[in-house]
Amino acid sequence: MSTAQPIRNIDELEAFRRFYLDNEPNLRNYALICLGVNSALRISDLLELRWKDVYDIKEKHFRKHLVTTEKKTGKETRIAINKSTRKGLSRYMESLDDVTGEGYIFPGRYNNTALSRSQAFRIIKHAADILNLENGISCHSMRKTFGYYAWKCGTPPAILMDIYNLSLIHISEPTRPEPI
């Protein structure tokens, strides 16, 4: 198994993000990638999201933030829903017949189940393969891509640690060779 890699080239990232809009239209898959790249959530948390987490059904508008409890850490996280994510989710939502607050954003094949991690992997891997992206693109690549661009834009390590719910900075630092 290879290590997941972020998408480092901005043009490749844009092509990846728009793959299910331009190349093989599928608004659910497009929304999955938009939310994945812009939220830094683990795929297990992303797939468990319900419409009520991102959209106020009664007021008929998208929330400014999504608040969820991470499966892996049990910690609560609050994530801003940016314009790009709202646009992707809005397009997808408009294509659906019925949206309920309790419904999964990314439903599985069977009634009242979330999309499986393996299917999410196939969706992401398919787009990466068709676009000839480097090896190592997987579900976790979306989370890493968020961090890569946030770091490149100068986001302080303390803020990234908060976004990723890390307690120690060395958890996220790549290992460096010892000086000779």
What does each model-found stretch correspond to?
Residues I10-S39, I43:
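Basic, Lys/Arg- and aromatic-enriched nucleic-acid-binding interface segment
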Residues M1-L13:
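Extended, non-globular alpha-helical segments
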Residues G36, A150-W151:
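Short helix-to-turn junction characteristic of helix-turn-helix DNA-binding domains
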Residues I169-I180:
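Single conserved hydrophobic/aromatic residue that forms the stacking wall/gate
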